[in-house]
């Protein structure tokens, strides 16, 4: 077992967060996208590598390339010298876990590995072992009930509605205002507008009426070319999509409040109170101002009146998963949890199902 610092790598649906155990924040945060440039001549003098990582690349994710980039470019470490904690989405297929394990031991020759469920780490980052995590990233939103450190798989819910959908939706709203954002570079501008200016209204109808009657919600945003655009009700209409997917954009999906409520209702009646009192927000798409208060209001409307609902929206929730991993692997009691190289050589990749529950 190596005495070297543990590397913690959170493979998000849109962004990789990587760093070292015991630290408060990841050292590297970058898009988890691999692709080939469309226009090679435009890249002459940049880097002749045929594949690269970054916001311009679309869809082609090669996990091997992402991990190579993480170790050698971002963290500048030799993976065979460091124990590695990887994260995975809830309900990830067993074959995925085995493939991750195989790559880490056979390609990167790591001395030790642990694979943890993202939502469980989010809960640990808040010092809890029981609660329900509403984790909204770039590509997917999950609600994951956890009891005494173990997720309850049959009650996990997911929707394909997350950050990139909100970016596309905001671009659509801005088109109605006469601003056109269509290329991938322009969508990056929209993402920045979304992250800087959008918020969740506690009462959507009331905010909409106020926006018609006054200019109180209007804000200016300077584009890279110096042009200034003004946005108003789009600031709260965009994230309203999470709460009203059908009404806002014609998608028949559960809202985040219904997703959370359904997950709780799928759990044993004896644990529901604990879940209602520990609703944890996690992931970049939960960073909107006002989202915690609104989710609380929506869940209170659904929960039994005798229950005191609590939503926890910590300021660093964008990195909650990573921080949970950093905290967990720093505990002295964690030393026995690792899958070692010896374990792998003896049992093969299936050892991950026994040691990482």
Curated annotation (Swiss-Prot):
Tell me which EC number(s) this protein carries: 3.6.4.-
What reaction gets catalysed by this protein?
Answer: ATP + H2O = ADP + phosphate + H(+)
User: Entry's Pfam families?
Assistant: Actin
Instruction: Give the main location.
Output: cytoplasm
Write the record's keywords in alphabetical order, separated by commas.
Answer: ATP-binding, Cytoplasm, Cytoskeleton, Hydrolase, Nucleotide-binding
Give the CC-aspect GO terms.
cytoplasm; cytoskeleton
- Cellular compartment(s): Cytoplasm, Cytoskeleton
One Gene Ontology molecular-function label: hydrolase activity
Q: Which InterPro entries match?
A: Actin, Actin/actin-like_CS, Actin_CS, ATPase_NBD
Coiled-coil segments: none
**Belongs to which family?**
Belongs to the actin family.
Give the protein's biological function: Actins are highly conserved proteins that are involved in various types of cell motility and are ubiquitously expressed in all eukaryotic cells.
Protein name, please? Actin, cytoplasmic
